Structures are given as C-alpha cells and as structure tokens.
C-alpha cells in the first residue's frame, strides 16, 4: 500500500473516468500527497438518525440548506453541519482514500469527520463539519476544506463499493 503523489494524481485526473470531476481549479487543488475538495453546500442536521447492523432500519436525518451571503461567506455558530463538496470522485478498483481536514480548519477551531472512501465509489460526497470554536467559524463558498489521500491496494478489489451512497449528489 502506497500513498499516491501529485504526479500520479494528475495522470488519474486525465483517465476515463477521471479521478476528480467538477474541480474549481484542478492545479490549485492538487497537493503533493492528495487532492483538496471544495465547499459546495452547507446544511444543518435536523433530527435524530439511526444505524443498525444490516441497514434495514438505518435512518439518515433530514438536513436543511443554509444560504451563503451575497459576498459568498457564511458564519456558522458552534455546532455540527453537513457539507457537500463540489467535486465528484471516481475511485478506481485498485485505490482507496482517506480524508483529512485542511490544517487551516483545525487552527480555526473546526474539523471534518468522514468515513473511508472505498474502491469503486463514485459520487459527490458529504461529510460532517464540526465547529468547536465558541465564537463560530466563517466559510466562503468553494473554500478548500478537505484533502483526500489516495492509497494503492495490494490487489484490486473484485467488487467495489455498491452501497446506497453510490452516485450520491451527482444529479
């Protein structure tokens, strides 16, 4: 298992399907060891969710969109939010990804929570933004907020991700 470099990521972005679609500025978003994802939308989480073993009783709570100001900024009070990214990711069957918040978020008292990005996943993903700073946190639309780190798998998976979130938010 090896972490991909910017050179390898550039090649994969030019592949078919491309590793990353709908980038705001691909060259800016390519980092030495990963790809940065940008903020498309922020929502508040409304109500309780539920998770069980076989997903037969899974319930993802509703979410209410928040509006950016005319200047493109939004001030978020302390709390949790759902964020949706601009980019659509197409992960090949021989890669997986782990996401980390950009260090600037952490230095401002906020962070992102996300799951493993499986081989074969395609979609415009969602993550949880947690604002810990009691004074809140400001974000601008299209801000670079997360970095995806791609790893090669020792062997290609026989069957890639096929869960309910496949192709999410791509319409």
From Swiss-Prot:
| An MF annotation (GO) of this entry | dCTP deaminase activity
Q: What EC number(s) does this enzyme carry?
A: 3.6.1.23
Membrane-spanning regions, if any?
none
The protein's matches in CDD domains, at most eight in alphabetical order, are given as: trimeric_dUTPase (cd07557)
Write down the species: Methanosarcina mazei (strain ATCC BAA-159 / DSM 3647 / Goe1 / Go1 / JCM 11833 / OCM 88) (Methanosarcina frisia)
Q: Which Gene Ontology BP annotations are present?
A: dUMP biosynthetic process; dUTP biosynthetic process
Report the protein's function.
This enzyme is involved in nucleotide metabolism: it produces dUMP, the immediate precursor of thymidine nucleotides and it decreases the intracellular concentration of dUTP so that uracil cannot be incorporated into DNA.
Query: Keyword annotations for this protein?
Result: Hydrolase, Nucleotide metabolism
Name the UniProt record assigns to this protein: Probable deoxyuridine 5'-triphosphate nucleotidohydrolase
Q: In which pathway does it act?
A: Pyrimidine metabolism; dUMP biosynthesis; dUMP from dCTP (dUTP route): step 2/2
**Similarity section:** Belongs to the dCTP deaminase family. Archaeal dUTPase subfamily.
According to UniProt, the reaction catalysed is: dUTP + H2O = dUMP + diphosphate + H(+)
Q: Which HAMAP family match?
A: dUTPase_arch (MF_00635)
- Which PANTHER family does the UniProt entry name for this protein? DCTP DEAMINASE, DEOXYURIDINE 5'-TRIPHOSPHATE NUCLEOTIDOHYDROLASE
What does UniProt give as the signal peptide span? none
């Amino acid at each position: 298992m090896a972490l991909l470099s910017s050179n390898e990521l550039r090649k994969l972005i030019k592949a078919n399907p491309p590793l990353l679609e709908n980038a705001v500025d691909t060259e800016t978003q390519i980092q030495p060891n990963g790809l940065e994802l940008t903020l498309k939308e922020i929502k508040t989480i409304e109500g309780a969710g539920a998770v069980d073993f076989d997903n037969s009783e899974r319930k993802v709570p509703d979410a209410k969109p928040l509006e950016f100001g005319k200047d493109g900024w939004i001030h978020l009070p302390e709390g949790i939010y759902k964020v949706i990214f601009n980019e659509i990711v197409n992960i090949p069957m021989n890669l997986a990804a782990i996401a980390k918040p950009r260090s600037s978020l952490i230095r401002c008292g906020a962070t992102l929570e996300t799951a493993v990005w499986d081989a074969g996943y395609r979609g415009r993903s969602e993550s949880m933004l947690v604002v810990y700073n009691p004074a809140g946190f400001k974000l601008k639309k299209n801000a670079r907020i997360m970095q995806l780190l791609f790893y090669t798998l020792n062997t290609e998976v026989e069957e890639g991700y096929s869960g309910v979130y496949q192709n999410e938010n791509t319409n």
